[in-house]
Amino acid sequence: MKMKLTSLLLKFPEIKLKSFPSGKNPDSIEIEYIQSDSRKTNKNDIFCVADSIGSKKKEFISNAKASLILLRTDSNVLNDLLEVMNSSKIFLECEIDPEQLQGRIASFLLGHPSKDLDIVAVTGTNGKTSLTNILFSLAKDQGINCGLIGTIGVKFGDRVIDTGYTTPDASSLNLILKEMKEEGITTVFMEASSHGLKLGRMNGISVRAGVFTNLTQDHLDFHSDMEDYFESKFRLFEILDFSKSTFAVLDYSAPNGSKLYHKILNRFPDLLIYALDDIYRKWKISDISLNLQGTSYVLGLPGNQERKISTNLLGSFNVRNTALAFLTGIGIGLDLEKMSNSLEKIPQIPGRFQIIYSKDRSRMAVVDYAHTPDALENIIRSVRDSQPKCLITLFGCGGDRDRTKRPKMARIAEELSDQVILTSDNPRTEKPETILDEIQTGFSSGFIPLLREVDRAKAIVEGISCLPEGGCLLVAGKGHEEYQIIGKEKRHFSDVEEVQKAFGLF
């Protein structure tokens, strides 16, 4: 909906009018929307100039069609811009990073679409995509019109949209939620990344439930340290909409699970918490059985009840994912028996423990998104549970990202695999050979990888050719991705396709 500039300034007193073209009346200015991408702006929009834009502020403001510009109060930057910019621009200022206000403004301009939706947001280092996809399947099977927002894209109705982000920017996110509401969606399962939470992309979103999977090392190129990373994840529980039947779900036994549990309890003592394997043992997992046909376990329920859970999803980590999904389903009112039945036939989640067999099924490959030390360890151990005669782990590490995890992942691969192949992930602007050098520092003295090949396609072919009968090649790091970033170029690349070609499947 359109709004007068004066009305917006009254609604958001933290925004001040810095510069206004002479001859115009502020009350005559109508605002349609707010965008942080200058290319998406229209004349009556606000261009939100995020701090992260850095030195390109002038360039992006010049290219923006928006007549209103919102940026952080900084007299030097503002005065410099006012001297060189077209005087027809209206400059607004605030004391904080404008990106922190963007979500609240976007939600307000669209009539708060999230208020009419049950939004379940999942955060954690690993498991977000799997868990949201499992929840989407469980709810859909019970006739709920639901939507999905995450790493693999946005899904609702017959629509699938690739946003390129785990958590879209605040303006895009609110537009997506508005479309979902208009399409009759009632429940949304979304991934809440630490980047998205710290940058305020979910500010202004009405979240009913927050789910936490785990917290292990990742993104230390973005977060100053693990405590900053933890606090960014905790932010999800600070933005819960307590006007709804709000609740939290977490894995108490997961890394940083107990820490989060007690912090939530201290800050929000009245918040309902479903804690898997908590200190009161209300939701305890036992009798786990793992094989290539599926996974089963017993989930303890309050009142000394138990429920046998069986699922086609593979790997010990999917024990935790499905159990967390079950608890979340209880929170949103799903039928227990129907959930149990649905878990037996969850659709394959792209790039998550995705098995590809050779034509004669004598060898296999597993494609998985694991790109953190914890995720790599979990997937290798899960593949080990299938007892392959030989396990070769192929992986690399992303360029321009947290470098400290590189030797740690090498150590894990060496200790848990029979052979290791080093290759490129998304090298971005780093030299691929330099990345591999840094990974190799984590190997023990004298350990030599089976192969070191920066060309990922060639590495996969070589890995498949080295597999003995009964062997398995784990291709870790990219999972569902259908691209590879080399330099600043994004090229088509799919681990699944490369494995299929190497097996001669097409």
Curated annotation (Swiss-Prot):
Biological process (GO), any one:
cell wall organization
User: GO cellular component terms?
Assistant: cytoplasm
Cysteines engaged in disulfide bonds, as pairs: none
* Keywords recorded for this protein, A-Z: ATP-binding, Cell cycle, Cell division, Cell shape, Cell wall biogenesis/degradation, Cytoplasm, Ligase, Magnesium, Nucleotide-binding, Peptidoglycan synthesis
Cofactors required: Mg(2+)
Specify which residues bind UDP-N-acetyl-alpha-D-muramoyl-L-alanyl-D-glutamate according to the UniProt entry for this protein: 38, 166-167, 193, 201
Which residues make up the binding site for meso-2,6-diaminopimelate? 401, 425-428, 477, 481
PTM comment: Carboxylation is probably crucial for Mg(2+) binding and, consequently, for the gamma-phosphate positioning of ATP.
* Positions of short motif Meso-diaminopimelate recognition motif: 425-428
Q: In which pathway does it act?
A: Cell wall biogenesis; peptidoglycan biosynthesis
Q: Which reaction does it catalyse?
A: UDP-N-acetyl-alpha-D-muramoyl-L-alanyl-D-glutamate + meso-2,6-diaminopimelate + ATP = UDP-N-acetyl-alpha-D-muramoyl-L-alanyl-gamma-D-glutamyl-meso-2,6-diaminopimelate + ADP + phosphate + H(+)
What domain of life does the UniProt record list for this protein's source?
A: Bacteria
Subcellular localization: Cytoplasm
Binding positions for ATP per the UniProt entry = 124-130
Q: Briefly state the protein's biological role.
A: Catalyzes the addition of meso-diaminopimelic acid to the nucleotide precursor UDP-N-acetylmuramoyl-L-alanyl-D-glutamate (UMAG) in the biosynthesis of bacterial cell-wall peptidoglycan.
Query: What is the protein's name according to its record?
Result: UDP-N-acetylmuramoyl-L-alanyl-D-glutamate--2,6-diaminopimelate ligase
Naturally occurring in which organism (per UniProt): Leptospira interrogans serogroup Icterohaemorrhagiae serovar copenhageni (strain Fiocruz L1-130)
From which lineage does this chain's organism come? Bacteria, Pseudomonadati, Spirochaetota, Spirochaetia, Leptospirales
